Amino acid sequence: MSLSLKRKDLMIVNMGPQHPSMHGVLRLIVTLDGEDVIDCEPILGYLHRGMEKIAENRSIIQYLPYVTRWDYLATMFTEAITVNAPEFLENIQIPQRASYIRVIMLELSRIASHLLWLGPFMADLGAQTPFFYIFRERELIYDLFEAATGMRMMHNYFRIGGVAADLPYGWMDKCLDFCDYFLQGVVEYQQLITQNPIFLERVEGVGFISGEEAVNWGLSGPMLRASGIQWDLRKIDPYESYNQFDWKVQWQKEGDSLARYLVRVGEMRESIKIIQQAVEKIPGGPYENLEARRFKKAKNPEWNDFEYRFLGKKPSPNFELSKQELYVRVEAPKGELGIYLVGDDSLFPWRWKIRPPGFINLQILPQLVKKMKLADIMTILGSIDIIMGEVDR
């Protein structure tokens, strides 16, 4: 005698929140039928700190230290968008040397962000070795940051009109040495990971997003380019001095987790190419504009002496934001990072709206994990690459 039993009981499981050094304070309420995912509901807001409201009660200079807490693995980009917004609003020109320094720092930060995505992503799939390899190269990048900015993380290096300090003597030679060394590391990653049959089984065809879906969901960054859309703001809407360098947009057409991995690995190669060109072509001249203009216009000649400029230097200048509005954006490692700024003839912004790429990209997660296995959730979530600091703001 055989009995056909049908189990209709569903299981609801909480995944997260985790420590910020791991997957962050993201909570997923997952409905399971055995190991099959029936539904997934992301719960956000555990890391909300009111960053937009804080901006409306601070001048841009006062607000700069806050922004490095959005995406704390790619802080140069949050600083860049924070100074770009008032620069565009008030038509402030920055020296060419400062623009090149910004590009170098941004691309180093992009590599560091992709490295710290790759290591934990592979660890989620069960491969621990790459996790230790990526920290080897990441430490070298942080050594370069420390030499130029004084900080390994949370650099507070960008300023309205330029950067806080020029590159120290010998820094560019060390940067070029790192570029040569890192290219060998990328080859090592690809030999270790890309053709690994176990890795391919876990990522190939998992988390598929078509090009049309990616556009309709408003995805950006590697999430968009891995679905066949060649959209990179450094090419489409150039900022800083990106239009002066020779490099290619990295994209794939498959739209799965493997394609997103390949896009990010390819971007690290292109970032090295941009850094090498910027270091070789960097012009002379000032690294900051507003301070130089202030000293030039100073009526008191004592303000130009050594003691004032180097020993008793006053804080960076503030200025009123005129009654205008604009939207500025940069191509961050995770996608389009934008700021909608509204000025009101005041030192403080009237409105400071942040467009974080991680928040937009995360919205498609429930659709991607439905009808997949429980183990695929970490693969898909890892391939999106989110930092909850910028998601919750």
UniProtKB/Swiss-Prot annotation:
Single GO MF descriptor: quinone binding
InterPro entries: NADH_Q_OxRdtase_suD, NADH_UbQ_OxRdtase_49kDa_CS, NDH1_su_D/H, NiFe-Hase_large
Recorded superkingdom: Eukaryota
Catalytic activity, EC: 7.1.1.-
Membrane topology (UniProt): Peripheral membrane protein
Top-tier EC class: translocase
Keyword line: Chloroplast, Membrane, NAD, NADP, Plastid, Plastoquinone, Quinone, Thylakoid, Translocase, Transport
Chemical reaction(s) catalysed: a plastoquinone + NADH + (n+1) H(+)(in) = a plastoquinol + NAD(+) + n H(+)(out); a plastoquinone + NADPH + (n+1) H(+)(in) = a plastoquinol + NADP(+) + n H(+)(out)
Any Pfam family: Complex1_49kDa
Cellular component, GO annotation: chloroplast thylakoid membrane
Localization (cell): Plastid, Chloroplast thylakoid membrane
The UniProt record lists the keyword Membrane: yes
GO BP terms in the entry: photosynthesis, light reaction
Disulfide partners: none
Subunit record text: NDH is composed of at least 16 different subunits, 5 of which are encoded in the nucleus.
Function recorded in the entry: NDH shuttles electrons from NAD(P)H:plastoquinone, via FMN and iron-sulfur (Fe-S) centers, to quinones in the photosynthetic chain and possibly in a chloroplast respiratory chain. The immediate electron acceptor for the enzyme in this species is believed to be plastoquinone. Couples the redox reaction to proton translocation, and thus conserves the redox energy in a proton gradient.
Xref: NCBIfam families: PRK06075.1, PRK07415.1
Alphabetical list of PANTHER family matching this protein: NADH DEHYDROGENASE [UBIQUINONE] IRON-SULFUR PROTEIN 2, MITOCHONDRIAL, NADH-UBIQUINONE OXIDOREDUCTASE 49 KDA SUBUNIT
Family classification: Belongs to the complex I 49 kDa subunit family.
Descriptive protein name: NAD(P)H-quinone oxidoreductase subunit H, chloroplastic
Native source organism of the sequence: Saccharum officinarum
